Structure formats: structure tokens, C-alpha cells
Regions:
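M14 metallocarboxypeptidase catalytic domain recognition
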Residues: 2-438
Length: 438
């Protein structure tokens, strides 16, 4: 297994974890992303009629806006809360149109560049430098996360084993942490992945937080000790490694993978529409330039194929699949591709109900929960549905904070409360697994 760091550089590989905070991405000349988002706006509107819906879809398509919520024009209907990023050269045209058409809207972000600078600017760099160790309350680059994994693999070998399940389209390792006490050869397991969609940075932040809490509270928390003694956790902090890296270097709001298309100049596939379950049906697009592009065929993306292969081999062992996204404050379970009740609905629904109540107990944050198709929207080819269809009885997708005030730019100040409350939900689901549900 090739580990991160310079080939042959033993000294670099043995740097203590506390020095990794110095190896961080710092804005050049004070501007992130070459100031490309200066003047861009994020607006929210709700179509009030079918006429407004069709008119908005048409103008959105013409102006090439970036939909934040929902993820596709096909999901917009009367009453749908719609958040979108409007480039500065289109914002005046769109706002004038909305005013003339008497369509109500709210400006959530008046200057996106300023919002980005505020979220991940020089304050973050200072925080990273000043912390005595790894700071779990800031966002980290892919290199930092992989180095963090490597260090934990060395310093906590009694609980953690790091390995690669393959390579991404651009050749990056797909690292996974196996977390748990090696008390016996076979134990049931839970799979957790974060960062399927590149721009949803709070996902990877939670995966890191989960590992931190596990290793720090194993001795002091009876529930955590029971979880790690009786289960293994396979944790993939960054699923879409190429896209996540690209969201740090080039486009903060990139969603897809980074694979190339032979017929179009557009890059990437929606890694949550690329699974072999009702592939490229409702809620997915055949067009390579769309954010919900399903790919040329199921598992076309090496990242998806690698995870699917890993889960298939362990389908008898893995009893829960948890995937972390943003944003909406929801806990979703199958089905996503159809309106139907899953066979073990009562057990799954009970686990979801208890999880969202546990989450709310921390800070009063309310999450909606239910089948993805009716709670969020219908989408085909999702990892959650695939996991359930392949014999994993508890399959959930979290949509973490918030509900749109910050959207994908959730401030670093909210990482701790978001992860703290989510931790309660995940522990609740895990403890539910350890009991028999009838």
C-alpha cells in the first residue's frame, strides 16, 4: 500500500501529527480561487404556480445557474424551496426578470467571494498554526486528511487499521480506516462514508470527528467501548477524493467526480447516481454536463466501483451503511428511487426516530426523517438504495446542517456543534444494531 508523503522520504512520513497542521493550503495573494466568485450571489425562491415553475426552469437553463437545492431542474415544482448560485454577469438579468415577473426571492449571500473568504480565509490558517495538535474544528485539505489517517494508523494501531481499496480516476488512493477492537476475527460491521459530493465539506469533517470521538472516549464511555468491542467500523473520510481536492484548488462548488468524457468537455459523474440500482432513471441525467449525470454505465467511476466491490465482498458482515451529505437537516432511508415501503420499515423507522431525537437533544436542531423519495425527492442510482438492495438492512443518508442560510459554506464555528449532535444520532443507530428489532 502506497501511503501519502514523498516516496522514499522516511523523515517526512514520520512527522508527528502536531506538525501536519503546518502543511496546509493557504490563499495566494489574499484571494481564494483567484477571486472567481466576486459578485456572485446565492438566492432563494419558491415557485408559486406551475407557470412560475416552467418560466424559472427556462431562465435558469439559459443563464446556466448553479443549483444548490434541489440538485436538478427536474426537481423544481410548485412550492419547492430553491437555492441557486447566480454568476455576477447574470445576476442583474435574473433579478430584473424576477422583479418584472413579480416572483418573490431572498438574497442569501450577496457576495459569494466574501462569504468564502470568511469561511476558509486567513482565520483558518491562523487556527491551524496555533493549535497544538490536529484541529477538528476547521476544514482540512485531502492531503491533511490522508496524513491524519496515516498518523492515527501508527499511533492507535490497537483500534485503527488503514488500507486502500483502490484508486480514483486521477490515480489517488482510496483510503479507508477500519476502526474497532480486534477481539475476535469476525464481527458485524458498519460502513460510513463522507464526501461523495465534493463541495459538501462538513461530511469529511464529521468522519474525522467520529474517529476522534471513538479513540478518545473508548476507555471512558461504556457505550463507545461496547460499540468498538462488538463491531467494526469501516470509515471512508473522503469518498470523492479527486472532486474534493478540486473543490479546494479550483472550484469550491464542484460536486461530481473528475473523470473525463470522450464526447464533451465537461468533467465528472455524480457519484450518487452511478450505482447499479434503477440506474439513470428518475432524478438522474444522461447529459455529461449536468450535476446529476449518471455516467456512461453503472459503476463507471472507479471510486464507486471500488466501494461497491468492497461492500459486496462483505455484505454478510456489514449491517449498516451510513453516508453523510449536506445540506438539508434530514435523516433519510430507502427507497430513494421509488415510493414504496421497505420490508423492515418498522425497525429502520424506529432507529431513525430515536436518532433524530437524540440529535435534537444536543442543541435543539430539528431533522426531518423518512424515506428519501417522499422526504427529499426521487433519485435513482444512489449508494443508499444500492446498499439496501445488496443486503445491508440499515441504510441511511444524512443531510447535515444547515437548511440554507449558509448552505455549502457552513462556517467552521459550526463544525463542533454539527458533529457533536450528529455523533449522538450515529451512536443511537449503532446501539440499535446491537439490539434485536422485531
Amino acid at each position: 500500500m502506497k501511503l501519502p508523503g514523498s516516496p522514499g522520504s522516511r523523515g517526512a512520513a514520520l512527522l508527528p501529527l502536531c506538525l501536519l497542521v503546518l502543511k496546509t493550503w493557504v490563499p495566494v495573494q489574499g484571494y481564494l480561487y483567484n477571486n472567481r466568485y466576486a459578485g456572485d450571489k446565492v438566492i432563494r425562491l419558491v415557485p408559486g404556480s406551475e407557470r412560475e415553475t416552467q418560466a424559472l426552469k427556462s431562465v435558469f437553463h439559459q443563464l446556466k445557474v448553479d443549483l444548490w437545492q434541489p440538485s436538478s431542474l427536474s426537481y423544481i415544482s410548485e412550492g419547492t424551496v430553491t437555492d441557486l448560485r447566480v454568476p455576477r454577469n447574470s445576476s442583474q438579468v435574473l433579478l430584473s426578470y424576477l422583479q418584472q415577473a413579480n416572483i418573490q426571492y431572498t438574497i442569501l449571500v450577496s457576495d459569494l467571494q466574501q462569504a468564502i473568504e470568511k469561511q476558509t480565509g486567513l482565520r483558518s490558517s491562523r487556527n491551524r498554526r496555533s493549535m497544538p495538535g490536529y484541529n477538528y474544528e476547521v476544514y482540512h485539505s485531502l492531503k491533511e486528511i490522508q496524513n491524519w489517517m496515516y498518523q492515527l494508523n501508527k499511533t492507535h494501531s490497537d483500534l485503527i487499521h488503514m488500507f486502500s481499496i483502490g484508486k480514483s480516476y486521477e490515480g489517488r488512493q482510496l483510503f479507508v480506516l477500519k476502526l474497532g477492537k480486534r477481539s475476535r476475527r469476525y464481527k458485524r460491521a458498519v460502513w460510513i462514508d463522507c464526501g461523495i459530493h465534493a463541495r459538501e465539506w462538513i461530511g469529511p469533517a464529521f468522519c474525522q470527528w467520529f474517529v476522534k470521538e471513538a479513540i478518545q472516549t473508548y476507555q471512558s464511555d461504556p457505550a463507545m467501548r461496547r460499540m468498538l468491542n462488538q463491531l467494526y467500523f469501516y470509515i471512508m473520510p473522503v469518498f470523492n477524493v479527486d472532486g474534493y481536492h478540486f473543490s479546494w484548488t479550483d472550484d469550491r462548488f464542484w460536486r461530481k467526480t473528475r473523470s473525463k468524457n470522450s464526447k464533451f468537455r465537461c468533467h465528472g459523474v455524480d457519484a450518487n447516481r452511478n450505482w447499479k440500482v434503477k440506474w439513470c432513471d428518475e432524478g438522474a441525467s444522461f447529459h455529461p454536463c449536468d450535476d446529476t449525470y449518471c455516467g456512461p454505465f453503472p459503476e463507471s467511476e472507479p471510486e464507486v466501483k471500488a466501494v461497491a466491490h468492497f461492500l459486496r465482498k462483505r455484505r454478510k458482515q456489514i449491517k449498516a451503511y451510513l453516508s453523510f451529505h449536506a445540506y438539508a437537516q434530514m435523516l433519510l432511508y430507502p427507497y430513494s428511487y421509488k415510493y414504496a415501503t421497505i420490508p423492515n420499515f418498522s425497525c429502520v423507522e424506529s432507529a431513525a426516530y430515536k436518532a433524530v431525537n437524540a440529535l435534537q437533544s444536543a442543541y435543539g436542531i430539528r431533522y426531518r426523517y423518512g424515506p428519501a423519495s417522499s422526504t427529499l425527492y426521487v433519485s435513482s442510482g444512489s449508494s443508499m438504495d444500492w446498499a439496501y438492495k445488496n443486503g445491508i438492512p440499515y441504510a441511511f443518508a444524512f443531510e447535515l446542517r444547515d437548511t440554507g442560510h449558509f448552505g455549502f459554506l457552513l462556517p467552521e464555528a459550526l463544525i463542533k456543534p454539527t458533529c457533536t449532535e450528529t455523533m449522538l444520532a450515529v451512536k443511537n443507530i449503532t446501539m440499535h444494531l446491537l439490539k434485536k428489532c422485531h
